[in-house]
Swiss-Prot record:
Keywords: Disulfide bond, Endoplasmic reticulum, Membrane, Oxidoreductase, Quinone, Redox-active center, Transmembrane, Transmembrane helix. It catalyses: phylloquinone + [protein]-disulfide + H2O = 2,3-epoxyphylloquinone + [protein]-dithiol; phylloquinol + [protein]-disulfide = phylloquinone + [protein]-dithiol. The chain crosses the membrane at residues 14-36, 88-102, 108-135, 139-160. It comes from the Eukaryota. Changing residue 58 to S: Abolishes enzyme activity in cell-based assays. Reduces enzyme activity moderately in assays that regenerate the redox-active cysteines with dithiothreitol (in vitro). CDD domains: VKOR_euk. It is an enzyme of class 1 (oxidoreductase). Phylloquinone binds at residues 142, 146. Belongs to the VKOR family. PANTHER family: VITAMIN K EPOXIDE REDUCTASE COMPLEX SUBUNIT 1-LIKE PROTEIN 1, VITAMIN K EPOXIDE REDUCTASE COMPLEX, SUBUNIT 1. Involved in vitamin K metabolism. Can reduce inactive vitamin K 2,3-epoxide to active vitamin K, and may contribute to vitamin K-mediated protection against oxidative stress. Plays a role in vitamin K-dependent gamma-carboxylation of Glu residues in target proteins. This is Vitamin K epoxide reductase complex subunit 1-like protein 1. Residues 1-13, 103-107, 161-176 are cytoplasmic.
Length: 176
């Protein structure tokens, strides 16, 4: 017996628009965060636009040891290891992945989107803890990316539920 063929299912328009907006914002913030970190490495006195006061300093957080490889990969792979990249590089890859995989309605893509979103929220919670309790800083760029990651988790969960319902309807026997 042949496996059932699923018809093409598309996601709601609001999901595509929301995903595009969140990913575009995430990509732009990741690029800016990368720029801030590079400038801070080049010139330790560099003052970024997001450095608004003594307690609101994104450059301090981005240039800290937790700003590269989540503060973990450097001790595993070495400070100059290829995987010990700025967190903004991982963010850029994540948002591009979310954008590209969001263009397809496949089950595998939906699972990858959901899994990577869960990982990003766990990473965001870890970095938020470091930001508040260890660095004692307020990084507006960091906080906004944490919110974007949480929004993507919600979008991906809604997508998974929507696609699951659509596929179940397709597999139900037709009543004459």
């Amino acid at each position: 017996m042949a496996a059932p063929v699923l018809l093409r299912v598309s996601v709601p328009r609001w999901e595509r628009v929301a995903r595009y907006a969140v990913c575009a914002a995430g990509i732009l913030l990741s690029i800016y965060a990368y720029h801030v970190e590079r400038e801070k490495e080049r010139d330790p006195e560099h003052r970024a636009l997001c450095d608004l006061g003594p307690w609101v300093k994104c450059s301090a957080a981005l240039a800290s040891r937790w700003g590269r490889g989540f503060g973990l990969l450097g001790s595993i792979f070495g400070k100059d290891g290829v995987l010990n990249q700025p967190n903004s590089v991982f963010g850029l890859i994540f948002y591009i992945l979310q954008l590209l995989l969001g263009m397809t309605a496949s089950a595998v893509a939906a699972l990858i989107l959901m899994t990577s979103s869960i990982m990003s929220v766990v990473g965001s919670l870890y970095l938020a803890y470091i930001l508040y309790f260890v660095l004692k800083e307020f990084c507006i760029i960091c906080i906004v990316t944490y919110v974007l990651n949480f929004l993507l988790l919600i979008i991906n969960y809604k997508r998974l539920v929507y696609l699951n319902e659509a596929w179940k309807r397709q597999l139900q026997p037709k009543q004459d």
